[in-house]
Amino acid sequence: MKKRKVLIPLMALSTILVSSTGNLEVIQAEVKQENRLLNESESSSQGLLGYYFSDLNFQAPMVVTSSTTGDLSIPSSELENIPSENQYFQSAIWSGFIKVKKSDEYTFATSADNHVTMWVDDQEVINKASNSNKIRLEKGRLYQIKIQYQRENPTEKGLDFKLYWTDSQNKKEVISSDNLQLPELKQKSSNSRKKRSTSAGPTVPDRDNDGIPDSLEVEGYTVDVKNKRTFLSPWISNIHEKKGLTKYKSSPEKWSTASDPYSDFEKVTGRIDKNVSPEARHPLVAAYPIVHVDMENIILSKNEDQSTQNTDSQTRTISKNTSTSRTHTSEVHGNAEVHASFFDIGGSVSAGFSNSNSSTVAIDHSLSLAGERTWAETMGLNTADTARLNANIRYVNTGTAPIYNVLPTTSLVLGKNQTLATIKAKENQLSQILAPNNYYPSKNLAPIALNAQDDFSSTPITMNYNQFLELEKTKQLRLDTDQVYGNIATYNFENGRVRVDTGSNWSEVLPQIQETTARIIFNGKDLNLVERRIAAVNPSDPLETTKPDMTLKEALKIAFGFNEPNGNLQYQGKDITEFDFNFDQQTSQNIKNQLAELNATNIYTVLDKIKLNAKMNILIRDKRFHYDRNNIAVGADESVVKEAHREVINSSTEGLLLNIDKDIRKILSGYIVEIEDTEGLKEVINDRYDMLNISSLRQDGKTFIDFKKYNDKLPLYISNPNYKVNVYAVTKENTIINPSENGDTSTNGIKKILIFSKKGYEIG
């Protein structure tokens, strides 16, 4: 009897998996890569942070910038982003820390003492017209300094201002960069240097202490670079739009508007871990890791005592390639799923979105070296035996922030909920850094072998006989991430480098991000599902209402790169109307209410008015494709598949060379080739559904359908030039076959799409 094979569409959910490898070369190579990534995250921490105001009372900030030395001047040539009338600075505040190379008494002075008050810690050292006071500074200590400048009705644009000091040897000089350090802008709950900060005199209106004045966070600001200095200034649309600068708004009461570990100021000025993705440098896009695993291969063997294992049994293994897709399940947690018409406005409703991070891995369905025998027959597995599982995997981070010292806990699940093993990663399975869009181990290195439940490989991952048979039948495993431990790297203001905080844990931060953001999942690029979280208002939480309103249109632009050429919202040339929207029930009710208030009948026309709220769940998918319950593309409309195959570069009796869109390639299981005679009788060349994979991708990106691959390695033989050669494409949604009891495995029952049909004399 022929072995029954079932072609399963690739289905996968996001997860993370543990590593266990003794490959020292792999470890050493990864450590070098990790150290390089971490060391790249540097910027200067030297100097003072300055705020320049157009009014006398520190209420109208025009520029926020840092100066590396005691030369705190801003020439008018660097103020082109500010309206001319606001370039006359009447007040300024500088803050930071000062340190000395030798203990001594110092006297401070400026180029405008008559307009200056200055403190070192709590001691006043300059008070406008009065004489400066000496202060003793000790080597090795950091002293907080604050300078206030006020000058009514200045006559020149910009500001010419220098800070000097004089030691006991009466040597006066502009304070150098080695002696100045930027302030540490911690959240107000911090109990570090904030305790000994001076409260003398007016302060910058900055309630959340993120470094951005409150008025700018509310009204809008932008960041530009002039002569190697970052300038944060109020948003002026008629100036900044022409330069292509980005307008930011953020909460004046949240140090991090998106609730991630990076302040709004750190994000927009670049004082941040350089491994954070570009889109998450926006204060309203959350920076956080999403860690999955890609399983590349699975090896199954009989679980035997090594001391009694004979030579023959050592070769009785099953090795299969696997594939993993990252998915988000739309479901109600009662095994039911609802997809209802959303009032014909361009959306649909799912009963719920799964929040679990898991991955379903599809095992290759092609013929094994053992021929037609079952897996159990190949391995000599009997009902009383158990089988060992060895998986080859890689970690991958599809989020927007790096995670350090990664230690996950993962369950391997068969079927719906048969847990084969739950494995907690140990220190020797740790990945030092997993940056966004990076793999561990990297693709040029061997994958990790996962084959044991403990540190000493004494407890293998096993399956009983019935579980083994189920795995062969379904050819699927699910990997659930129960939890993941990993550290955060933050900017160190003392040395300008990123430092991994070993006391931090992403698992403590992620719940706060999830509670205060809207989640959007989008599959626009290569049909890969990408999740992003955007800061959004929670009307029932007073603090969260201080965030700027966020529209669905703006969220798509800042998180996914949508743009508006000719006023139409597009993604990589595709109009927004080519995508559909899917909401969970709570989100759909919110959207429905907003549409009613707007008197709108089509969501696409009011995307700039639909406001996001925290905890919304929105899935946006390419309309051309069909999806399974995990939102993986498994098919497409027939017209779409045909259109994708219309560009045949050349054809012959050896095969077809085509130029096929990579999105279409992802949904194809393969092709069926047949010869049709003049009376309409058809003979399938590859008439087994495990022989559909007769195509290959060439280095130039073109697809070749090889007629010889399952035709005894010979070109097609066409006895009559008027006979037709028909080629059909088969999508993944049409390859779940239930063979008949007599073992029939023909392709007769497969739904197929005709993509090529020519007579023999036409193909040469």
UniProtKB/Swiss-Prot annotation:
<feature type="site" description="Alpha-clamp">
    <location>
        <position position="207"/>
    </location>
</feature>
<feature type="binding site">
    <location>
        <position position="210"/>
    </location>
    <ligand>
        <name>Ca(2+) 2</name>
    </ligand>
</feature>
<feature type="binding site">
    <location>
        <position position="208"/>
    </location>
    <ligand>
        <name>Ca(2+) 1</name>
    </ligand>
</feature>
<feature type="region of interest" description="Domain 3, heptamerization">
    <location>
        <begin position="517"/>
        <end position="624"/>
    </location>
</feature>
<feature type="region of interest" description="Disordered">
    <location>
        <begin position="176"/>
        <end position="214"/>
    </location>
</feature>
<keyword id="KW-0614">Plasmid</keyword>
<dbReference type="InterPro" id="IPR035088">
    <property type="entry name" value="PA_Ca-bd"/>
</dbReference>
<feature type="signal peptide">
    <location>
        <begin position="1"/>
        <end position="29"/>
    </location>
</feature>
<feature type="region of interest" description="Disordered">
    <location>
        <begin position="302"/>
        <end position="333"/>
    </location>
</feature>
<dbReference type="GO" id="GO:0044164">
    <property type="term" value="C:host cell cytosol"/>
</dbReference>
<feature type="binding site">
    <location>
        <position position="217"/>
    </location>
    <ligand>
        <name>Ca(2+) 2</name>
    </ligand>
</feature>
<dbReference type="GO" id="GO:0044175">
    <property type="term" value="C:host cell endosome membrane"/>
</dbReference>
<keyword id="KW-0106">Calcium</keyword>
<dbReference type="Pfam" id="PF17476">
    <property type="entry name" value="Binary_toxB_3"/>
</dbReference>
<dbReference type="GO" id="GO:0051260">
    <property type="term" value="P:protein homooligomerization"/>
</dbReference>
<dbReference type="GO" id="GO:0005576">
    <property type="term" value="C:extracellular region"/>
</dbReference>
<keyword id="KW-1032">Host cell membrane</keyword>
<keyword id="KW-0964">Secreted</keyword>
<feature type="binding site">
    <location>
        <position position="210"/>
    </location>
    <ligand>
        <name>Ca(2+) 1</name>
    </ligand>
</feature>
<dbReference type="InterPro" id="IPR011658">
    <property type="entry name" value="PA14_dom"/>
</dbReference>
<dbReference type="Pfam" id="PF17475">
    <property type="entry name" value="Binary_toxB_2"/>
</dbReference>
<feature type="site" description="Alpha-clamp">
    <location>
        <position position="265"/>
    </location>
</feature>
<dbReference type="InterPro" id="IPR037149">
    <property type="entry name" value="PA_heptamer_dom_sf"/>
</dbReference>
<feature type="region of interest" description="Domain 1, calcium-binding; LF and EF binding sites">
    <location>
        <begin position="30"/>
        <end position="287"/>
    </location>
</feature>
<keyword id="KW-0732">Signal</keyword>
<feature type="binding site">
    <location>
        <position position="264"/>
    </location>
    <ligand>
        <name>Ca(2+) 2</name>
    </ligand>
</feature>
<feature type="binding site">
    <location>
        <position position="208"/>
    </location>
    <ligand>
        <name>Ca(2+) 2</name>
    </ligand>
</feature>
<keyword id="KW-0472">Membrane</keyword>
<feature type="region of interest" description="Domain 4, binding to the receptor">
    <location>
        <begin position="625"/>
        <end position="764"/>
    </location>
</feature>
<dbReference type="InterPro" id="IPR048853">
    <property type="entry name" value="PA_Ig-like"/>
</dbReference>
<feature type="site" description="Alpha-clamp">
    <location>
        <position position="493"/>
    </location>
</feature>
<dbReference type="GO" id="GO:0020002">
    <property type="term" value="C:host cell plasma membrane"/>
</dbReference>
<keyword id="KW-1134">Transmembrane beta strand</keyword>
<dbReference type="Pfam" id="PF07691">
    <property type="entry name" value="PA14"/>
</dbReference>
<keyword id="KW-0165">Cleavage on pair of basic residues</keyword>
<dbReference type="GO" id="GO:0016020">
    <property type="term" value="C:membrane"/>
</dbReference>
<dbReference type="GO" id="GO:0090729">
    <property type="term" value="F:toxin activity"/>
</dbReference>
<dbReference type="GO" id="GO:0141070">
    <property type="term" value="P:symbiont-mediated suppression of host MAPK cascade"/>
</dbReference>
<comment type="function">
    <text>Protective antigen constitutes one of the three proteins composing the anthrax toxin; it mediates attachment to host cells and translocation of edema factor (EF) and lethal factor (LF) into the host cytoplasm. PA associated with LF forms the lethal toxin (LeTx) and causes death when injected; PA associated with EF forms the edema toxin (EdTx) and produces edema. PA induces immunity to infection with anthrax.</text>
</comment>
<keyword id="KW-0843">Virulence</keyword>
<dbReference type="InterPro" id="IPR003896">
    <property type="entry name" value="Bacterial_exotoxin_B"/>
</dbReference>
<dbReference type="Pfam" id="PF20835">
    <property type="entry name" value="PA_Ig-like"/>
</dbReference>
